Structures are given as C-alpha cells and as structure tokens.
Amino acid sequence: MANKAMIQRELKRQNLVMKFAKKRAILKQQIQQASSLKEKLALHRKLQQLPRNSSPVRLHNRCLVTGRPKGYFRDFGLSRHVLREMAHEGLLPGVRKASW
C-alpha cells in the first residue's frame, strides 16, 4: 500500500487542477490570440505564476483502494492486484474470467 502522504499529495494536486483549470485555459487561449511578442511574454509569465501542481501534467493515476501508482486500470480506477481480487470475488459487474 502506498504511503498515506503520497495519496494525500495526489488528492491535493487533483483539487488544484480543478481549481485553476478555467484560469489556465483562459490564459492559454489569450496567449494564442495575442498579437505582439511582449503581450505573449506577459501572459506567459502570468501562466508561470500559477501553482506548479495546478498543471494536469503533474497528476498521476493511483489505485482508489491501495494508492498504487503502477498497474493502473483506468476503466475501474484500480491497480491490477485489487482488480484481480475483486473480479474473483464477483465484486465487478460484467467482468468474467476469459475462456476460449
């Protein structure tokens, strides 16, 4: 299981991304529409002054149960270990063992 601090850090990043998403999108659009280089640089500076963790690139998918960052299945939001256990217990509707 992942360190609790890592899970909380990731949740904090998700909150920051949601909080600044609109402002970030507006600034990026203004940068594209800016005509002069000085204007673009000023807008780019404003974009850089936003918190670093408010960028969606810094997010990392983690398992909802264990917080594991690797082996993550987006469809379920779970790591491969938890997915396998829950599938065997029949807790995931529509998931069956493969047979061919």
Swiss-Prot record:
- The principal location of this protein is plastid
Q: What keywords would UniProt list here?
A: Chloroplast, Plastid, Ribonucleoprotein, Ribosomal protein, RNA-binding, rRNA-binding
Note whether RNA-binding occurs among the keywords.
yes
A Gene Ontology molecular function term for this protein is: structural constituent of ribosome
| Highest taxon above the source species | Eukaryota
Q: What is this protein called?
A: Small ribosomal subunit protein uS14c
The protein's organism comes out as Tetradesmus obliquus
Coiled-coil residues are none
What the record says about family reads: Belongs to the universal ribosomal protein uS14 family.
Q: Which compartment or compartments is the protein found in?
A: Plastid, Chloroplast
Mind giving the lineage of the organism this protein is from? Answer: Eukaryota, Viridiplantae, Chlorophyta, core chlorophytes, Chlorophyceae
Q: Which GO terms describe its biological process?
A: translation
